[in-house]
Amino acid sequence: MKLLKGVDCTSCCIAIVIARFNSFINENLLSGAINALQRKGQVKAENITVIRCPGAYELPLAAQQIAKQGNYDAIIAIGAVIRGGTPHFDFVAGECNKGLAQVALEYQTPVAFGVLTVDSIEQAIERAGTKMGNKGEEAALSAL
């Protein structure tokens, strides 16, 4: 049996689509993702492309446009959907999840899910680099 002990993605091209909405959370997730790509995957900075879109609902369309080009080995989607007092959370989180999965299947390109779906700002902060780790970093590791 051959055991792989590391990831060498020096020639990999990775796209990161990130939502602008809730940027105070998303920027920490982005930092975690880039750190993991460069330190653990040896991905060169010039091989990482960051594309910003308005919010999490728009992430699937941005990912689809990138996947359609066929220039990237993987796509990482980053965002934060925080529950409020209306059903808006359920619609945005559900459609974002389904849309990103559809892109991965349709274009046979890995799409790592780094979108937080949380009940509070506190939970988002915990998952963006504090006591619950950094889900952006975890998404990048999944992409690798």
Swiss-Prot record:
One of its GO terms (molecular function) is 6,7-dimethyl-8-ribityllumazine synthase activity. Pfam families: DMRL_synthase. The keyword Zinc-finger does not apply. GO terms for biological process: riboflavin biosynthetic process. InterPro entries: LS, LS/RS, LS/RS_sf. 5-amino-6-(D-ribitylamino)uracil binds at residues 21, 56-58, 80-82, 113. The active site is at 88 (proton donor). Signal peptide: none annotated. It comes from the Bacteria. (2S)-2-hydroxy-3-oxobutyl phosphate binds at residues 85-86, 127. Pathway: Cofactor biosynthesis; riboflavin biosynthesis; riboflavin from 2-hydroxy-3-oxobutyl phosphate and 5-amino-6-(D-ribitylamino)uracil: step 1/2. Keywords: Riboflavin biosynthesis, Transferase. Gene3D superfamilies: Lumazine/riboflavin synthase (3.40.50.960). Forms an icosahedral capsid composed of 60 subunits, arranged as a dodecamer of pentamers. Catalyzes the formation of 6,7-dimethyl-8-ribityllumazine by condensation of 5-amino-6-(D-ribitylamino)uracil with 3,4-dihydroxy-2-butanone 4-phosphate. This is the penultimate step in the biosynthesis of riboflavin. Belongs to the DMRL synthase family. This is 6,7-dimethyl-8-ribityllumazine synthase.
